[in-house]
Amino acid sequence: MPQAKLILQDGSEFEGFTFGSEGATSGEVVFNTGMVGYPETMTDPSYRGQILVLTYPLIGNYGVPDDSGADNLFKNFESDRIQIQGLIVSEACENFSHWSAKQSLSTWMKQHNIPGISGIDTRALTKKLRSSGTMLGKIVIDGLPREMQLGGNSAFSGIISQGVDFDDPNARNLSAEVSVREP
């Protein structure tokens, strides 16, 4: 597993290992302290453009359920796609077990081109964010050739890792990005 870093706007760096898509991305770094519901949280439009830190120590242990539903409503998700820019966890579990699971968290993130970092002390990071407030951050992958350091979400495709700026999602029209195009 390649090494990765979360670099905060204040210069702080947190090192870990990649999972999901191996690419660079940036966004506002926020945290969630929930014990369950990572698929719902990751697809929640209110997290659009953000790098999400999950404080529960083991994420991915129940996998990701099927995304099918009825009448264009998803039974296990909050929207039709992952909304976050990246995911930061203490430990990403590859061996999942749940009757409704269809795939691992890492596989799902790869399908949606979302990078993640595991092996980070998410509770220390959360304390920093709680005392300093949310900050802009970026995920960069060590050891990948520059041409492979593409952005983690379609809004950032083609950005070279070391050149990824601290993107503030609040400067964009997020409502337009998450709204349905037609009824």
Identify the meaning behind each predicted range.
Residues 1-183:
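RNA-binding accessory domains that recognize and position tRNA/RNA substrates
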